[in-house]
Amino acid sequence: MRLLLLVPLLLAPAPGSSAPKVRRQSDTWGPWSQWSPCSRTCGGGVSFRERPCYSQRRDGGSSCVGPARSHRSCRTESCPDGARDFRAEQCAEFDGAEFQGRRYRWLPYYSAPNKCELNCIPKGENFYYKHREAVVDGTPCEPGKRDVCVDGSCRVVGCDHELDSSKQEDKCLRCGGDGTTCYPVAGTFDANDLSRGYNQILIVPMGATSILIDEAAASRNFLAVKNVRGEYYLNGHWTIEAARALPAASTILHYERGAEGDLAPERLHARGPTSEPLVIELISQEPNPGVHYEYHLPLRRPSPGFSWSHGSWSDCSAECGGGHQSRLVFCTIDHEAYPDHMCQRQPRPADRRSCNLHPCPETKRWKAGPWAPCSASCGGGSQSRSVYCISSDGAGIQEAVEEAECAGLPGKPPAIQACNLQRCAAWSPEPWGECSVSCGVGVRKRSVTCRGERGSLLHTAACSLEDRPPLTEPCVHEDCPLLSDQAWHVGTWGLCSKSCSSGTRRRQVICAIGPPSHCGSLQHSKPVDVEPCNTQPCHLPQEVPSMQDVHTPASNPWMPLGPQESPASDSRGQWWAAQEHPSARGDHRGERGDPRGDQGTHLSALGPAPSLQQPPYQQPLRSGSGPHDCRHSPHGCCPDGHTASLGPQWQGCPGAPCQQSRYGCCPDRVSVAEGPHHAGCTKSYGGDSTGGMPRSRAVASTVHNTHQPQAQQNEPSECRGSQFGCCYDNVATAAGPLGEGCVGQPSHAYPVRCLLPSAHGSCADWAARWYFVASVGQCNRFWYGGCHGNANNFASEQECMSSCQGSLHGPRRPQPGASGRSTHTDGGGSSPAGEQEPSQHRTGAAVQRKPWPSGGLWRQDQQPGPGEAPHTQAFGEWPWGQELGSRAPGLGGDAGSPAPPFHSSSYRISLAGVEPSLVQAALGQLVRLSCSDDTAPESQAAWQKDGQPISSDRHRLQFDGSLIIHPLQAEDAGTYSCGSTRPGRDSQKIQLRIIGGDMAVLSEAELSRFPQPRDPAQDFGQAGAAGPLGAIPSSHPQPANRLRLDQNQPRVVDASPGQRIRMTCRAEGFPPPAIEWQRDGQPVSSPRHQLQPDGSLVISRVAVEDGGFYTCVAFNGQDRDQRWVQLRVLGELTISGLPPTVTVPEGDTARLLCVVAGESVNIRWSRNGLPVQADGHRVHQSPDGTLLIYNLRARDEGSYTCSAYQGSQAVSRSTEVKVVSPAPTAQPRDPGRDCVDQPELANCDLILQAQLCGNEYYSSFCCASCSRFQPHAQPIWQ
């Protein structure tokens, strides 16, 4: 432009000037080139041509005036239906390409400021990216508009599809028109009394063009758009959308609103024409400022009657390779939807078409599989995975190809990586503390913790693969001078009562030089027996092991019992032992050596105290024993009896390698166990579980022990951690799991295993277990270390009570008599004060029967054979609980003097009874038949049924000689005999009776012929487990346990359709009850309802109709009990009761039922897509969803839809309501006229099926048919 302004000045010479003439440069254009190919094949592309500029300028510029390139429109014809968007095709070129470490599928983004940049958004993400500076020429600037991008700029395209054309469409969409072919419809919706929510503004008719709807002022209200069927296109169901262009009614509807947080007027505009009516609504939240609307309709009147309308095409089902689109096609008139058959005279528009037929691009990429487990859990390892090349065609089909095809792709994932680089956990010992003594042999302690990377504190389980360094070690100083404190025997400290804050721990301090009176003058030097422990804050690890004791410690932990009367000699010598020895106390919750001590219930001694053995320190220590006697060492003696152990579990002892192993010794005391509970040990010991030690039993009465016991004797805290725990006196170490090698067995009528003290074993894998406290007849908890221990060890309280108390068929626990006295016949009784009473001398075999409440029933066996003493046995007593070879009471000896131990070389099998015991059980249960014979080591139990050997997979012989039958079948009923394989031995008989569905109940006469069976309810959890041990005939039949149902079971069961559920019903009682399930008072019986052997009801493939209340009824022939269970079927919503078509005469009442299966359901009715509001006069909606329309009119005809909503679920069902004109007044019929049907006017079969003969209008066409059919009542219009 600067040059153009200067040119005139150069052409006008100044007057009188002699300046030389300047020569003008001549830059010219060359010829135009050919037109380039069109940028698109359809839909309006752009072609261009270019021309060169010939210039003589030496600076590289040109002075040619005009454009060097010109453009024109081409291929303006519309693309075929279903063709892909042109901008979307350009974004799809980047599909599968790596972008910031990921691969995306890209879609076009239209809301960027520069409309001609190629901005794309990844599918499923919320950001867009500019892939190119400019889109391909001919790409529309915005969807729904004709303007296109050329060289990165938006250029105008006229309605004649020509580039830079000035021709525009008028409001009627005529190119270059003057707007005379249509008429405008405009107005303002300014109603102010709007309810909160959706309010209809207007309905834009089908065929409308140049639509504009906007708010008069900004507000917090929103516009919404839906079709006449109630389906929302914009802002439906209280979901407000962002500004966008959306397809609706075969046009593009542009929605404009302020950004999030900005307040701007709502605006809608569309080109049209619309292919269906659009309902415009205002979501009102504040006063309406007014909404302006304007649209145009063609001057030609639409054809009257019904016509087809259709919505916009849906998105293509596939992005390439061929997909399909669908749209809604429906019949309308007067902006309302009607059934399709109303438009059947007109051709129906297509509702489905193909789309995106172009082939999918093939892409290749690397794909990696999952990582394999790391080769090391810590300290650095490696893991690998498979990496391979896959080829994808974009349609979801992938296949693996050669890696060479992906060789050029960047970023191949690694196939190997390092893992678990953190440092392994290891034990971290603290420095040793000071020695516990200043002279002599003491102990020093230290703390050992499990530490991880950077010294972080970890749980001890993280270091379980390594042996934990010892927490204590002996320390030796110079010999101490003989001081008064040597008179005290000091035990090891017990567990701390708390793990942090403030705890206490105890130890045993007793006089070591004789009775307590010998130490009376040395009380000032008595070491403390209680000290604080674990005083650190609770966020720090505990300093010493602790227990969780919920009881407050008593001021005197050792509660002395009354004096034990000792036999004959030196009875006073045992008096002080009974006072000091910890086993002479009734409280068993704090036994020494228990690592936790959390005995859940405080048990008080209800029966006689266990008999006491003379402690090893009864006699004063002599100078010959020296000050370093192993019994006074911190960890007691080694198994040899004289070497001091250097640590727990006989550490440092000679010849005890298996004791020092992790899981200790096998029962042979030589082999090393490979795991808890003697894992890896041989099961066969020839009946000798003590490695050659005979399985003899100790006498049940108190024995005067004047010699050293056979078993090792330790302090109470030590023997519980030995291989088989303590003997009955809590001091001596047992030689076997059933108290082998122990003397002084208590006289309680319980199995031997139930008389032993709890033993936590020698390992440290602590777990809560149960043991039986014979002195009170109850079970209590204790902490078990995971290996070794004795047989008084049970997994649950029920198992404990079943194994110990379950063997008694008298009272459940020792019952005190009128004087609180418990009576026994094993040579002595027990006085209320705990003193042993001398047995009365008996001259005959008869034994006096005691009353029932005084401690149990007694019986006498058959008369003994020649030279054999009569054998008496307590009611319910286990036969092996007594010394089989012991001397019988009443045979020789002075009264009040117990017989000395008598070990017989032969083993006599004692029988529980000659008459058969009775066991009752139901089909499918598990039954254990126990043999009460105490067989010799070389003898084995043999079982027979009805005299024949037993051979079946359901019959399994156990190690203890018992027989398990599972599952129980009808043919298992009969008489079972158990006996020894040795000749000349008697057998025990057990009568097994099968209880059927009618529940057989024994009469009192039948009960008197059989010993009472064990109550199956005592073995709760092991259905049908019963045993006849100790069952005897009695004149006092066992009272039946009252029937009881477990009311703690779930009362509400939720299920989904098709699910399999179980409803439990646990009952117990005697006789065992029968279970029946009922529903609505009737037994439940169907192939899908199955009653299980344990009483539960299993329902397969639950259906909606299964929901309701079920009753479990238990009956045992005497008592009855029941409980109900509600089954709730949480299925999908369903609507029933609404037929497809309802015909109602004009003026009658339409009753539309909408029965919805489900709870908390909201029901809404609509007619032709518009909500039906109850007005309280003609239209009513009942709470159950029924719609009532009184005085029906012709304008009420239409499609009624019932919609049910429950949470996120929704379901709807429609019915067509047809209104028929009332029949004319019926004329008196000619009696002589024939009564015939008129099939050309009505289908009489349908009228009969619908029971419409009561309607005079319909019955007039079907006289003959209705005469043969007399309706019972007037039909209800539905």
Swiss-Prot record:
Q: What is this protein called?
A: Papilin
Is-annotated flag, keyword Secreted? Answer: yes
Q: Provide one Gene Ontology cellular component.
A: extracellular region
Q: Where is the composition biased (Basic and acidic residues)?
A: 582-599
Q: Which InterPro entries match?
A: ADAMTS/ADAMTS-like (IPR013273), ADAMTS_ADAMTS-like (IPR050439), ADAMTS_CR_3 (IPR045371), ADAMTS_spacer1 (IPR010294), Ig-like_dom (IPR007110), Ig-like_dom_sf (IPR036179), Ig-like_fold (IPR013783), Ig_I-set (IPR013098)
Record key words, sorted: Disulfide bond, Immunoglobulin domain, Protease inhibitor, Repeat, Secreted, Serine protease inhibitor, Signal
| Pfam families per the UniProt record, alphabetical | ADAMTS_CR_3 (PF19236), ADAMTS_spacer1 (PF05986), I-set (PF07679), Kunitz_BPTI (PF00014), Papilin_u7 (PF16626), PLAC (PF08686), TSP1_ADAMTS (PF19030), TSP_1 (PF00090)
Set out the biological process GO terms recorded for this chain's protein. extracellular matrix organization
Instruction: Spell out the family assignment given in the record's similarity comment.
Output: Belongs to the papilin family.
Region annotation Disordered: where it falls in the sequence: 544-632, 805-901, 1014-1042
All residue ranges annotated as the PLAC domain in the record: 1231-1270
Q: Where is this chain compositionally biased, Low complexity type?
A: 608-620
Q: Where is the BPTI/Kunitz inhibitor domain?
A: 754-804
**Which residues belong to any copy of the TSP type-1 domain?**
26-80, 304-361, 362-421, 423-481, 484-539
Origin: domain of life: Eukaryota
| Disulfide links within the chain | C38-C74, C42-C79, C53-C64, C316-C355, C320-C360, C331-C343, C754-C804, C763-C787, C779-C800, C931-C978, C1065-C1112, C1154-C1202
